[in-house]
């Protein structure tokens, strides 16, 4: 099966994860794709292919004869899609991009003024959405590339390769992708996630991340008699937001610049719950950002009365660079392989996190991130070039070759 056909099959499964669910996985329908993948891997001939009760898919492709001594290498992608935009009833379209603005089938378009990098793909086949859902290239393109690479190796036993440990995780998009990862089922001490963006990107630096939950307690009084009595929690929450640096938001930052990002505000005059995230690649700046939020809350409690603002601040994950520096051969090998197949590698910082970041810190499995070829993740403008997915299959085959 070609990687494109495989990808189109995978995106037919709704695997949207949930920010609010406490189940594992957070949505039951992720297991539908998990079961399909486990069956497919078993049919192809991988060993121990199965989905565990928590929705994780594991499989092993043994080394070719004579290569059993070479350390195993892991390949990881995630099955879920972002809850930010609907991932149900996806209708992908394959178009040959002729340049200019690209109309989507049902609504909207990919505008060159918004996405000037589109010019790189003139003449290529792009898989795009119909404008009503995301596409799911994040990360079903990665899943399809890994499975297709394994299929190629099984069909070409003359290609010598090391043992390959495969894992497909649920709930990566909601930060829980490695919560229940079982290293006993993953015989590799180093791995790559295939969860990045455009072709050529290699990532081993990610954000340090923290989550903010701020509960604001107001006092509600009938507005007709509220003078000097009402404490409107909505306006109090707004005051907190106004203290955050206006230029340090996602819309005003790039590269290695960190930010504060308010993601959700709900409530009324009596109580408001605000959620936000803090991100920075630099650990000292990250800690300073957390201190800034704590000081802002302390100041507001001084203004409105102690207990008016209750802060919960929790670290989510850390920059994996510290864990990758002793294992830079993983980066060097990926760069060399890309050049060998005609792709110019580009080292870029991850403005987010990956399963690999947590595996690097929590499981001591150094795990940089490779591109999938896709772009514009988490939205209706998401797309992936067919040629980029095909090239990534070549990259993965060469990466595990001995």
What are these regions (language model features)?
Residues 67-163, 168, 391:
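Active-site metal-coordination/substrate-binding segment of hydrolases
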Residues 233-402:
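Metal-dependent amide/peptide-bond hydrolase catalytic core
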Residues 192-226, 233-234:
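Phosphate/diphosphate-binding glycine-rich loops and adjacent basic-rich segments that engage nucleotide
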């Amino acid at each position: 099966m070609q990687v494109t056909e495989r990808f189109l099959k995978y995106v037919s499964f709704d695997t949207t994860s949930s920010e609010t669910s406490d189940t594992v996985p957070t949505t039951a329908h992720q297991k539908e794709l998990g079961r399909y993948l486990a069956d497919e891997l078993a049919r192809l001939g991988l060993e121990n292919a199965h989905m565990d009760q928590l929705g994780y898919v594991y499989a092993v492709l043994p080394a070719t004869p004579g290569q059993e001594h070479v350390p195993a290498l892991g390949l990881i992608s995630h099955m879920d899609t972002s809850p930010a935009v609907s991932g149900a009833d996806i209708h992908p379209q394959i178009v040959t991009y002729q340049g200019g603005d690209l109309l989507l089938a049902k609504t909207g378009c990919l505008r060159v003024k918004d996405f000037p990098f589109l010019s790189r793909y003139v003449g290529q086949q792009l898989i795009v959405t119909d404008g009503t859902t995301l596409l799911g290239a994040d990360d079903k393109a990665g899943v399809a590339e890994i499975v297709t690479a394994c299929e190629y190796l099984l069909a070409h036993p003359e290609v010598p390769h090391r043992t390959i440990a495969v894992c497909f995780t649920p709930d990566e998009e909601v930060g829980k992708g490695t919560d229940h990862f079982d290293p006993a089922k993953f015989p590799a001490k180093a791995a790559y996630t295939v969860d990045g963006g455009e072709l050529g990107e290699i990532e081993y630096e990610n954000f340090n991340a923290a989550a903010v939950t701020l509960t604001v307690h107001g006092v509600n009084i009938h507005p007709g008699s509220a003078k000097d009595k009402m404490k409107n929690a909505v306006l109090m929450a707004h005051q907190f937001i106004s203290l955050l640096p206006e230029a340090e938001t996602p819309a005003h930052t790039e590269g290695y610049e960190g930010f504060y990002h308010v993601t959700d505000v709900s409530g009324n005059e009596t109580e408001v719950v605000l959620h936000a995230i803090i991100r920075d690649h630099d650990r000292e700046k990250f800690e300073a950002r957390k201190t800034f939020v704590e000081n802002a809350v302390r100041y507001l409690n001084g203004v409105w009365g102690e207990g008016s603002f209750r802060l919960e601040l929790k670290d989510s994950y850390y920059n994996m660079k510290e864990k990758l520096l002793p294992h830079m051969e993983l980066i060097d090998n990926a760069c060399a392989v890309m050049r060998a197949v005609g792709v110019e590698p580009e080292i870029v910082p991850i403005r987010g996190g990956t399963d690999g970041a947590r595996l690097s810190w929590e499981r001591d499995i150094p795990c940089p991130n490779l591109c999938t070829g896709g772009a514009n993740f988490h939205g209706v403008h998401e797309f992936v070039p067919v040629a980029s997915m095909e090239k990534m299959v070549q990259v993965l085959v060469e990466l595990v070759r001995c």
